[in-house]
Amino acid sequence: MPGCSIIITATLCYNEAQNMLLDATITEKSFGDKQLMRSVSVSVDKGEKVAIVGRNGAGKSTLFAVLSGQDDDFTGDITMRRGLQLVATAQEHHGLQDALVIPYILAGVPEYTVLKQAIDELPLRMGDNLRLIDEYTQALERFSAKGFYDIEAQVEVSLRQFGLLSGEQQASELRLGELSGGQKRLVEVIKVIHADADLALLDEPTNHMDMEAKNRFLSWMKQSREAMLIVTHDRDVLHQVGRIIELRDNGTTVSYTGNYEQYLRQNMHTTNADMNDFEHKQRRIKTLKQKVLDYQRLKEKSRNPGTIQNFKRLELTARAELAELEELQKPSFWIDRDSVDQLDTERAQRYDRYKARNIRLATHTVEGSRRQLLTLDNVVLGRPAASGEVDPLFFPVSAELHEGQCLQLRGRNGAGKSTLLTKVFSLDGAADIELLEGSITLRPEVRVGVYYQEIQEQYLRQPLAQAIERLYIDRGLPISETKVRSLLHDYLFTQADRDQLLAQLSGGQKARFQLIAMLAGDQQLLVLDEPTNHLDLPSIEELELALARFTGAILFVSHDAYFAKYLQPQTVDIEPFA
């Protein structure tokens, strides 16, 4: 095919169209024995902001890897505009521990590296060569026109705005190996922002962002002229896009024009139509099964060879159609809670019959006593520095938490929110945190369930089922094989998942394990640290509903504005000392 190169079973083509930037059709993509995609279509036009959503495990990260060129083991066609400048967030950083952050970011900026190399090297060898002198002059002019003379300073500003640098930290000395996984994700976002490419591909960009950083990102989204394709479940981000592509469990895609609110309305109508189609096919299956039986009986009763052949042909035709219909997977029906409330009784009952399985969260719902569970009185915490000195992390914090109350800790990344939770609830690392001022009073008999940002190390190297069993044993709770199977079912894990190492599971699957850990036992106080980061939209809704039903106390950290608005918490702001 002219202008195309074959990559395994994938075809990459280039097109001269001006508005079309990317047009992909994937007819087969598998992960192990599981077929993830069979009819996937993704397109992005010039300047368009498009989001990809879907259930955990549907294959969104795999699709991102395919579209960004990190995975070429698929069947299908990907067409890009000729000369397209594309930048994508990297999912892994193997072998880059010593890489300096600023050069790493600038390496992702089209033209910068080439022009910088020309400006640095041409003076050393051009002499009186007019061609090289002209090349050098053009490089200088282009470098200036692109604003590259002050780009390092601009990147440093972004590093500070996104909370990766503070105080007297030198940007020129910052290395990737010094950063957490969440901070590396922010580096990728900064790389995309400064790349000024035609098309930016971003995978869950706002995970681990604080509210100030997220607002900066959303502002950039609105103002930027470049096209974007974003894998996300962040409803604040989904509100800013112009189209949403849903990757379904059956390996197909549906495209919705508009932002999140418009997507929800269209999804309600699409789901109703899909349920009609599903019911029609179920009726057709029932009819075909009866026809097969009828043709068999008529064939047996007949004595005419021609009539027997006719019934045999009709039976084979019915069996072929039946086999085709029975191979079709049941669609994953989901309608958001507000739209469900708008359904008439008949449609609501039908949706209740056919809706997709969602996680089932059992929370403590016995009316509490409203007693005071936790008191923070002018608390100031600190960590010992290399010099031995202990500097305060934040200004004094005071708060009270009663049973039945919901409290949100707010503040920038690095302000000390997670550190405060660690100290208050004696989590891993609490011994390294010093109480410099004030007092912390937690009722000793209160049963606390914690949702960690990271899974505790002792469970990561165990198969999922064993990790659940170990978790219950470590907490002195009764556990049985039946209970393990029940939990796996309630949290949407498959039989294949149960023997997978926890460390090898997806972000969404790990998040569901964290929910199991938080709710193990009859908890009176739930502590959640960024719980919506890796959950899909239906799971986030179920978590919100479960927390709204919970009659104990809730203390959480989240930069998900929709999540916080639904829970309507009281708030405590953590102000960093430095």
For each predicted feature, which ranges?
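Flexible loop/N-cap segments at domain edges
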Residues: 340-450, 454
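Coupling and communication elements adjacent to P-loop NTPase active sites across diverse families
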Residues: 14, 19-31, 111-185, 266-389, ...
